[in-house]
UniProtKB/Swiss-Prot annotation:
Substrates-to-products reaction catalysed: n ATP + n H2O + wound RNA = n ADP + n phosphate + unwound RNA; ATP + H2O = ADP + phosphate + H(+); GTP + H2O = GDP + phosphate + H(+)
Outcome of mutating R283A: No longer unwinds or cleaves 5'-tailed RNA, decreased ATPase activity
InterPro entries: P-loop_NTPase, PhoH, PhoH2-like, PIN-like_dom_sf, PIN_dom
Protein name, UniProt field: Protein PhoH2
Free-text comment about domains: Has an N-terminal PINc domain and a C-terminal PhoH domain, suggesting it has RNase and nucleotide hydrolysis activities.
EC nos: 3.1.-.-, 5.6.2.5
Organism: Thermobispora bispora (strain ATCC 19993 / DSM 43833 / CBS 139.67 / JCM 10125 / KCTC 9307 / NBRC 14880 / R51)
Gene3D superfamilies given in the database record: 5'-nuclease, P-loop containing nucleotide triphosphate hydrolases
Domain (PINc): residue spans on this chain: 12-137
Keyword Phosphoprotein: no
Family listed: In the N-terminal section; belongs to the PINc/VapC protein family. In the C-terminal section; belongs to the PhoH family.
Record CDD domains: PIN_VapC_PhoHL-ATPase
């Protein structure tokens, strides 16, 4: 069941909003023996989203799911069986008089709240289910039970991609001499976990390999002129430059160097090693407030400015203007919003998905499914800066990390030390316990 019940013997009425169906088109079948109600305005919203570049696929899948039920049962305005429960599209219960004046705005959220409140007024045990944080807050202000849709969410383990092991002096000597050693303590760690190896006489950095041995990570490695300043950054560079790892996830607070590391690794792979043809940086629309490109003034290049500028700012901090000009003139760098990824196959490219914390899980999986031959993808993210309120703290990129950790094609590292400036370090430290 998607949502837990405090009284499992009582049938509850779950009113779903559009965000739930976009996150999981099959969500309607995940409520066990309970009643599922879809307000008619949700169908209208799904129709409006059918051609959305990021969410259109999920809107169409949800509509197909409902249409299959219609074909099977003839009509949906009356409850029809689904699993052990029922589902219906609600055409009535639309009188807004049950709402306080401040919520009678006539928008779609108000219409969904009207349905839920009218059903509750009839004595039903109503729960409004939404991925949208403001929607849940509005429902709670009416005294309605409101819950986040949790099916498919994972329990975050807190895995940072790093571990610390105590080793003998002989172990450390063998690691420096041969480059790899066998450590029993490392065999239970996920593949590609970064290691701080400590002995009485020194320390070293290492990484768990797919065969569970430990490989030395050199601290003096330079990638396109950039050297890691912290243990985590050095491990990150080692992961980024390993062509056998197809997906690298880099998490961390503002100023920890996520984007700089990813861009330098891309420049090294494309310009120096010729491993890929180009760098493609995707940024979600939510990175600058969520506006659609069409609503912004100016030409397409003008509209792209806010998305591209953050990438160029980072490039300017790690390389010279001449290199940036060369990369752009040779068409070796593209900065695109994720609206451009649907229908593309990304071959022979070093792909960076920036601000990945703002992507819903379905959109993120769509991105990863577009990675073609001889391509790699880097996800940079900071879950403390989610601009998309439909993405919870434990879904999206967090779910991907938890599901993929330990696979030889995947690696994750969380950066903890701010390298941007003393001001950024201060803000990161002071605000690290504030969560959304």
């Amino acid at each position: 069941m998607a949502v837990s019940s405090s009284n499992p013997t009582q049938t509850r009425t779950y009113v779903l909003d559009t965000s739930v169906l976009l996150a999981d088109p099959a969500s309607m079948s995940r409520f066990a023996e309970h009643e599922v109600v879809i307000p008619i305005v949700v169908i209208n919203e799904l129709e409006a989203k059918r051609h959305h570049p990021e969410l259109g696929y999920f809107a169409r899948e949800a509509l197909r799911f409902l249409d299959d039920l219609r074909v099977r049962h003839g009509r949906l305005d009356q409850p029809v069986p689904i699993g052990e429960g029922t589902i219906r599209v609600e055409l009535n219960h639309s009188d807004p008089a049950v709402l306080p004046a401040g919520l009678r705005s006539g928008d779609n959220d108000s219409r969904i709240l009207t349905v839920a409140q009218n059903l509750a007024a009839e004595g039903r045990d109503v729960v409004l289910v939404s991925k949208d944080l403001p929607m849940r807050l509005k429902a709670a202000s009416l005294g309605l039970n409101a819950e986040e849709y949790r099916a498919g969410m994972v329990i975050e383990s807190g895995w940072t991609g790093m571990a610390e092991l105590q080793v003998t002096d002989d172990d450390l000597r063998m690691l420096f001499e041969h480059g790899t050693i066998e450590l029993a303590e490392a065999r239970d760690l996920p593949c590609h976990t970064g290691l701080r190896l400590l002995s009485t006489r020194g320390s070293a950095l290492g990484r768990v390999t797919p065969d569970k041995s430990v490989r030395l990570v050199r601290g003096d490695r330079e990638v396109f002129g950039l050297r890691g300043r912290s243990a985590e950054q050095r491990i990150a560079l080692d992961l980024l430059m390993d062509p056998e790892i197809g997906i690298v996830s880099i998490g961390g607070r503002a100023g920890t160097g996520k984007s700089a590391l990813a861009l330098c690794a891309g420049l090294e792979a494309v310009l120096e090693r010729r491993q890929h043809r180009k760098i493609i940086v995707f940024r979600p629309l939510y990175a600058v407030g969520g506006q659609e490109l069409g609503y912004l003034p100016g030409t397409e290049n003008d509209k792209m400015g806010p998305w591209a500028q953050a990438v160029y700012d980072t490039l300017g901090a790690v390389t010279s203007p001449e290199v940036i000009e060369e990369v752009l003139d040779r068409g070796m760098l593209e900065v695109l919003p994720l609206t451009h990824i649907r229908g593309r196959s990304l071959h022979d490219a070093f792909v960076i998905v920036d601000e990945a914390q703002s992507l819903e899980r379905g959109v993120l999986l769509t991105v990863l499914s577009r990675i073609g031959s001889n391509s790699r993808v880097v996800l940079t993210h900071d879950v403390a800066q989610r601009d998309n309120l439909r993405v919870g703290r434990h879904d999206g990129v967090v779910a991907v990390v938890e599901k993929l950790k330990g696979h030889p094609l995947f690696a994750h590292i969380t950066l903890t030390r701010s390298e941007r400036s003393p001001i950024a370090a201060l803000v990161t430290e002071m605000l690290q316990d504030i969560t959304i």
